Amino acid sequence: EDPPADVALLESFTSQMFAGRGTYGWGRSWEADVHLILQWARLQPKILYEETILRDGLEGCRVLVLPGCDVLPRDVVEAIRRFQASGGVVIGDEDLCPAIRADYVLKIRRRTEKADADKAALQAQAEELRQWLKSCYSWPVDSSEPDVVLRRRVAGEAEYIFAINDRRTYGDYVGHHGRVMETGLPCSATVRLRRQGGVVYDLVARRQVVATCEPEGLRWEVQLGPGEGKVFLVCPREIGGLQLANTPEAPVGGRVCIDVRVVDREGRDFPAVVPIYLGIIDPAGKESEGTGFYPACQGKLSARYEVAPNDLAGKWTIRVQELASGQELVGHFVVR
């Protein structure tokens, strides 16, 4: 799940109606460009609406971004003022509702239809914002490269870091128009996670990653090919092994129970959602229904296989692989 958001961006319906602002579902507006600025500043904003603020308030939020918010309802303005008075940071633009005074003002920039120039300008604004925020904000996860876009999710004691390579250049397809950079380029970055210790696994490569513990958190290196993305699992302990228990035999029309445990080196259930590949293979070597990818929540997975009337009799194989460290286990059952 997404962690509680400490950065939020308001999409104002009132400003859409009375000032002609808003994205209307497209990515060509100033509001959409502000979202890109936040992304390249390595922030993870949550989208808020006026009714969200009125219903839930702004508790837990540290930074509130208000692009294209020329006109706001009085009660929303009052909520934002209370947020700011309690220490919250407000980032606005040159068109911000005059009843609110922003702590930082983004200069509105219109697209030039030159993709490389527009991206460079927005990334420059992102870097200026980063430098200003350093005095009042601490990044939960950060990247040394703006083109490595990060997103953080959590499950119990574990954190999941998504890293996507956004470095691109003009290609041979539509690049000559200068509006789209459609060819990906490789990119490397250092990722830092504000966490004291832990073990890092690359869920795409299915292996452990070398990570360094530093005073400000956990650090590791990421290499991404053109257009490539990776998911990293960060957890408090190493995976120790797999355990498999299953029904030893079942008649046609019966049921096979398959229980998988992912454990640490002490044999305790692993405190994370670990992706599992489960293969159910008949005596002829063909994968059966039920084969696929499953989550082992807090290290546990329980699956059931219903033996079909036309399934082959004989010795079946269960193949289990956890996709963090790549460990595998094989079991069997007999269909009578």
What feature does the model see in each segment?
Residues 295-305:
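Aromatic sugar-binding surface patches on proteins
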Residues 242-246, 292, 327-336:
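Edge beta-strands of extracellular beta-sandwich domains
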Residues 304-312:
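Short, surface-exposed loop/turn segments at beta-strand-coil junctions that are enriched for proline
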Residues 1-257, 261-275:
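Carbohydrate-binding surfaces of carbohydrate-active enzymes
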Residues 230-234, 313-324:
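Short, aromatic- and glycine-rich surface loops/edge beta-strands on solvent-exposed regions
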Residues 272, 297-299, 312-319:
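A glycine-anchored, Pro-Gly-centered beta-turn/N-cap motif
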Residues 276-293:
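Short amphipathic beta-strand segments in non-cytosolic proteins
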Residues 286, 324-329:
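Short, exposed coil/turn segments at beta-strand boundaries within extracellular/luminal domains
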